[in-house]
């Protein structure tokens, strides 16, 4: 099994900053935006985007945490650890996750989101898009496009969970 670091901490920070600038450019009314991090690492990426938006625009956007597990079609989990302290009805919600792969986690997160309210618009920001979609889902904001084979794995590490920031590709062959 071979592991190769493809994004270091500096490159990750730049990708998050780029996503933040794109959010600013594409959203005319930032005061109507709610950030929704998809557990686990998407929550920490959402917090970083929230911090950058505060630094750049002086805005304190609300942030929520979506747990997609109870809404997945490939596992049964009863406990829902979603934390959404703001009413999302009529809001522009930006889902934030670490890796976009098949699209199934995003579908589950959207199901969770619409169970909480009716947002005006939902968009998606991901740190890494690796391709191989099984559902017709695409990201609106992408930090890095990293094409992979179906046997390779992308691992995103964030300092808040893993002690360091990096993205690695693992080749099991």
From Swiss-Prot:
Renumbered to this chain, motif PRPP-binding spans: 93-105
Q: Name the CDD domains on file.
A: PRTases_typeI (cd06223)
Give EC number(s), comma-separated.
Answer: 2.4.2.9
Instruction: Report the Gene3D superfamilies cross-referenced here.
Output: 3.40.50.2020
> For this chain's UniProt record, which GO biological process terms are given?
DNA-templated transcription termination
Keyword Glycosyltransferase included in the entry's annotation: yes
Catalytic activity from the UniProt record: UMP + diphosphate = 5-phospho-alpha-D-ribose 1-diphosphate + uracil
Tell me one Pfam family matched here. Pribosyltran
Any idea which UniProt keywords this protein has?
Glycosyltransferase, RNA-binding, Transcription, Transcription regulation, Transcription termination, Transferase
Which major enzyme category is it? transferase
Q: Does the keyword Glycosyltransferase apply?
A: yes
- Superkingdom: Bacteria
Its function? Answer: Regulates transcriptional attenuation of the pyrimidine nucleotide (pyr) operon by binding in a uridine-dependent manner to specific sites on pyr mRNA. This disrupts an antiterminator hairpin in the RNA and favors formation of a downstream transcription terminator, leading to a reduced expression of downstream genes. Also displays a weak uracil phosphoribosyltransferase activity which is not physiologically significant.
Query: Which family is it part of?
Result: Belongs to the purine/pyrimidine phosphoribosyltransferase family. PyrR subfamily.
Task: Summarize subunit and interaction data from the UniProt record for this chain.
Answer: Homodimer and homohexamer; in equilibrium.
Q: What is this protein called?
A: Bifunctional protein PyrR
* Organism of provenance: Streptococcus pyogenes serotype M49 (strain NZ131)
């Amino acid at each position: 099994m071979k592991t190769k670091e493809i994004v270091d901490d500096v490159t990750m920070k730049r990708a998050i900053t780029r996503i933040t600038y794109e959010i600013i450019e594409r959203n005319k009314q930032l005061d109507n935006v709610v950030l929704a991090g998809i557990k686990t690492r998407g929550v920490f990426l959402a917090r970083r985007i929230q911090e950058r938006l505060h630094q750049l625009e002086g805005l304190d956007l609300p942030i929520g945490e979506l747990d997609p597990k109870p809404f997945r079609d490939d596992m049964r989990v009863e406990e829902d650890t979603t934390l959404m302290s703001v009413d999302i009805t009529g809001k522009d919600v930006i889902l934030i996750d670490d890796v976009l792969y098949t699209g199934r986690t995003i579908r589950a997160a959207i199901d969770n989101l619409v169970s909480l309210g009716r947002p005006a618009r939902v968009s998606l920001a991901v740190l890494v898009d690796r391709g191989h979609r099984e559902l017709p889902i695409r990201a609106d904001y992408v930090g890095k496009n990293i094409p992979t084979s179906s046997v390779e794995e992308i691992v995103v590490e964030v300092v808040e969970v893993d002690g360091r920031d990096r993205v690695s590709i693992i080749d099991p062959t």
